[in-house]
Amino acid sequence: MIEWILFVILSFLAADFIAGVFHWWEDSYLDQDTPIFGRLIGGPNQLHHSDQYAFLKGSYWHRNYTTIIPSMLACGACLCFDATQDAWLTFLFLSQANQIHAWGHSKGKNGWLVSMAQRCGILQSCKHHAEHHRSPYHIRYCVMSPMLNPILDAIGFWRYIEYVV
């Protein structure tokens, strides 16, 4: 039982880390004029940073298709190539990264279960995520949980990968 719980937690944190790296990449390198990804991701991401609530106005599918489609393709690849179940579960969690991010902008509108998960520190709270939208704007890229951001921010991870790239 403990092994299963640990497996779920680690898969969730792995998904949060992957989502954080992609979020950093979007913020750092994409805009609406970027070939291929500009219209799908760059433009909406820029809009989100000028109007944090804009992406809440669309449907579930409109808000999440950019994470659902690649995640489901990755899940399919995991099943086809007999990958471990932790990879499959990580991509399943990752498919919901934008939705969990949306909940981080929806204080008082998330229902009791999501609100409780935010209060307990399982899901990222609105207060935690708000730090990403304040100066200096280069912290708190992981959008699913509050667990990884303090560590990654403290060790300068985002500045390090900026240097590497």
Language-model features and meaning:
Residues G42:
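N-terminal Rossmann-like or analogous alpha/beta NTP/dinucleotide-binding catalytic cores
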Residues E3-S11, C78-L94:
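Interfacial segments of alpha-helical transmembrane regions
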Residues I2-I5, V21-G38, L47-H62, T90-V165:
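Cytosolic/stromal cytosol-facing helical appendages immediately following the last transmembrane segment
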Residues F12-A14, Q118-R119:
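Alpha-helical interaction segments
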Residues W61-L79, S145:
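Core segments of transmembrane alpha-helices
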